[in-house]
Amino acid sequence: MPQSPKDMVSQFSFLYPTKDVTDTTVIDLIQPIFVRTTKGQLGIPKLDHRVVQVPMTQLQREIYKTLKSEVRRQLNPVLSDSSRYELRRIGKCVMKVMEFVSNPSLLSNDMDYAFDRRVGALLLESDGPKIDYVCRRARQLAAEGKKVLIWSSFVQNVELIALRLSDLGAEFIHGGVDAGDESDFDTREGKIKRFHTDDTCKVLVANPAACSEGISLHKVCQYAIYLDRSFNAAHYMQSEDRIHRLGLSPDAKPQIEFVECEDSIDQVVRTRLELKVKTMAQALEDSSLSVEISSVDYDEEAEDYDSLTADDAKAVIEYFFSGDQND
């Protein structure tokens, strides 16, 4: 799944080197030469998307404001006309903020904050509101007899959640888990098999960069929770397909929850991903590629910040530099 029509230009140019193709013409040029069967045509049940927004604690919000100010300072040099879209630098700044929102303890790895007393006090409070919610929700679903797939872009989150849910038989997969024989439960294949066959294994925690392709979980799991997401639309759509694919029974009700902190970078990521999915749906003439949100009250990471596009950068800069500069 490309992130934008621009990603299809090189593919089209390779197939038709004599054709003049640009970002704006590639969609019209590709329409007559591709065939794609949509999920709607296959009769796959519609996926239900829900957003759950949780508030930061007062202390986390205070540190978040400090972090935003620091990011604004770091981004100032890239706002000049000559270097406005130094995407990698912007991506690194954004990833630090996303890490903190998903799990405040990740900020303790940053030497600028390692000895901040506020960070220490925050870590004594909890694992953070998002992880607290995800673990609580996973327990609710497990109590209903459901298996749950939990996604996070950060390896430390993947392992931490699996540890917190070890009483539910939680397994985890990220880039550090080796491939191997499915009879060995320490391998990627072994963990997947256990999730499929062991009734005591109620939870699988995974990283989209390492586990978004080549795995079918829809036969045993129709519920996924995203602790966080990156700007990488390809990883997101592929990870979603682990539980939403051909073979689902017609009466299945697959559901996805996106967990966000209120008034945070999470909303910027969601808006950008929704736009990318909508753009690709129009390009591929596939209305099933949609993320209709209903609100609910209440070095793999390097690959993610390298996936930041110029439009993502614009959205990030607008978020950090618009509105109240004291926020």
Locate predicted features.
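Conserved Helicase C-terminal RecA-like lobe
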Residues: I44-Q60, R84-S216, S287-D327
